[in-house]
Curated annotation (Swiss-Prot):
UniProt subunit comment: Homodimer.
Gene transcribed to yield this protein: rlmH
Naturally occurring in which organism (per UniProt): Clostridium novyi (strain NT)
GO molecular function: rRNA (pseudouridine-N3-)-methyltransferase activity
Enzyme class name: transferase
Subcellular localization(s) per the UniProt record: Cytoplasm
Reported function: Specifically methylates the pseudouridine at position 1915 (m3Psi1915) in 23S rRNA.
Residues noted as binding S-adenosyl-L-methionine in the record, renumbered to the chain: 76, 108, 127-132
Sorted UniProt keywords: Cytoplasm, Methyltransferase, rRNA processing, S-adenosyl-L-methionine, Transferase
Protein name, per record: Ribosomal RNA large subunit methyltransferase H
Family from the record: Belongs to the RNA methyltransferase RlmH family.
GO CC field: cytoplasm
Substrates-to-products reaction catalysed: pseudouridine(1915) in 23S rRNA + S-adenosyl-L-methionine = N(3)-methylpseudouridine(1915) in 23S rRNA + S-adenosyl-L-homocysteine + H(+)
């Protein structure tokens, strides 16, 4: 299975890069992982709603440029469906059984995802009602994908 993580914003913190590297290495025995980092648009402190909408649309266009037609798109969205680790494992497993071998998981920038990206998404996933920094969300997402593969393989993993 090919999994592409499309994320807005570059990782600057070394500890987050180390965590990403570790989970990428662990996932390499289960899937082909590709992480696409896109430059975020600068948001002025006094940005109006219109300014924020334009920024989300620009970031959304960059995201959609990396989404191939055959990809099953899972957008991380505060208003998406919450799922347990087991439910995420089931979703990933079912996609593989249905021949959906290209999955894109999308993490927006600090303003979230554009309407266009959300409309393209096949599934909207929420990890919590809380808001997380999008850089940290990348680590959390990779850990949950790794956990899903361990669950599907029937392998033990620390709970």
């Amino acid at each position: 299975m090919n999994i592409t993580i499309i994320c807005v914003g570059k990782l600057k913190e070394k500890y987050l890069k180390l965590a990403i590297d570790e989970y990428s290495k662990r996932l390499s025995r289960y899937c082909k992982l590709n992480i696409v980092e896109l430059n975020d648009e600068k948001t002025p402190d006094n940005a109006s709603e219109k300014d924020e909408l334009i920024i989300k649309q620009k970031e959304g266009s960059k995201i959609l440029a990396h989404v191939k037609e055959n990809m099953y798109v899972i957008a991380l969205d505060l208003n998406g469906k919450m799922a347990s680790s087991e439910e995420l494992a089931e979703l990933i497993g079912d996609l593989g059984l249905k021949g959906k071998s290209n999955i894109a998981l999308v993490i927006g920038g600090s303003l979230g995802l554009s309407k266009e990206v959300l409309n393209r998404a096949n599934y909207k996933l929420s990890f919590s009602k809380m808001t997380f920094p999008h850089q940290l969300m990348r680590v959390i997402l990779l850990e949950q994908i790794y956990r899903a593969y361990k669950i599907n393989a029937g392998e033990p993993y620390h709970k």
